[in-house]
């Protein structure tokens, strides 16, 4: 199976919509907001607001993701972005104990993966991660953070692996920095610019 990749943009937003609708309605907006919105995830307005806000972020160039395709069908994505694009991480209790690295000029974050059920276990997330890291390098590099799940209970459920796994990040050269509560771990890697 030969996959291709594309960056999330106004041109690829309709492809993102196709796969985001399958994912459940978050639209990868949780970490793009500094504070939670006051709607429950079961509320139809929550999904509409997330879609609208994601589109606006993409149009402003404030939302980054790698889309993975099987021919012309979008089958997965990896969201990444600069710290200012994904501010919610800073509010996490575990993250606040560690904080961002001192003196980091450019801090990037990898927050979400989604792979269509029919394509899981076929290397889609790995391809998306590699492409995201290459994109970060082209954009000047810097320190990249990841927050994979380490809880065996949570990792056993596909829907809870949206952060990725420690193993996939370790293979890309990330090192463990600190635990994030009992369910996650902070990992970092420095990428030199092109």
Which residue stretches match the model-derived regions?
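Conserved N-terminal entry element of GNAT/NAT acetyltransferase domains
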Residues: 1-38, 194
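Conserved beta-hairpin
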Residues: 16, 63-78
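Active-site rim helix/loop that mediates acceptor-substrate recognition in acyltransferases
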Residues: 30-64
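Conserved acyl-donor/pantetheine-binding loop and adjacent beta-alpha core of acyl/acetyltransferases
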Residues: 56, 60, 74-112, 120, ...
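Short hydrophobic/aromatic beta-strand or adjacent loop that forms the aromatic wall/cage
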Residues: 63, 182-187
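Conserved hydrophobic beta-strand within the GNAT/NAT acetyltransferase core sheet
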Residues: 110, 144-146
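Conserved acetyl-CoA-binding loop-helix of GNAT-fold acetyltransferases
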Residues: 110-115, 121-138
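Conserved active-site alpha-helix within GNAT-family acetyltransferase domains
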Residues: 138-142, 150-178
